[in-house]
Amino acid sequence: MDYLSLIKQPIEAELTDFIDLFNKSLMHSDGLLSQALDHIRQRAGKRMRPMLILLLAKNFGKVTEVTQHSAVGLELLHTASLVHDDVVDESSERRGQASVNATYNNKVAVLVGDYILSTALLHVSYSHSEEIVRYLAELGRVLSNGEILQLNSISNDEISEDIYYQVIKQKTAALFEACAGIGAMSAKASPLEVEEAKKFGQNLGIIFQIRDDIFDFYDSKEIGKPTGNDMTEGKLTLPVIYALKSTGDEDMLKLARKVKSREVTQDEIAQLVAFTKENGGIEYADKRMWDFHADAMSFLDTYVDDKNIYHALKAYLDFVIERKM
């Protein structure tokens, strides 16, 4: 059985209910808004975040309406953030399809993102849980702060792993942390169990982002985007940060600063990609992923008793670290 089938096995019925509720949340009678929402609904991914919420809820109790509305609210919040991110990053593509801003324009994309965000707040309110409502509201602030922190890090000359992890923990890892935490909260887990679930989610999110960053050093035919795309956007990720710090190569550091100032050429990016591969950057990032994997496994061994959920969450961890795209 493949990873995704293992992940879905304990929550197949609950996942179907989630998809129905989520799709209904993105329906509208207005022509333009309806078209834009249909466009977004058609690019549904693997549902990794909702599945994590459902699995954690089932681990600590059961999936309820509180769980489902919270899951829809969080996925809508994430969706809205992606629509807005594409405007900020001037991205023309999202999950292999034209982005909302590319299909329509920035004004429409911002308004559609705002509508989805409002719908997210509505669904979270249906949870009737002050704790979950507050957590989702705070998550929105954290994600926005993460974007600002990333913009600041690009314009800052400093190159460090600490800043790299600070950004991740307020972006990708914050989302996974919230999924695990909200799943546990919705099942009325104890405060300790909720905190441990959050740590598990954060580890998952860090692994997810490092894997994404490793993909950026390989051919576009393998991963569906240009090699060195992050550097084109002014971002220095873990593999190249390690290679720069471990070698102290001044010529490469000069190129790295050109990346951050958006003055780098494609040939210079290719040099940095080759330099990173030749100096252990990929191997180091891979090792760090497995370190976070080990931390995440300790949660499963301590807090997950049901063997089907254990296998599903183990498959989830393994999928995130071993995925090919």
Residue ranges and their predicted role:
Residues 1-325:
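All-alpha prenyltransferase/terpene-synthase fold signal
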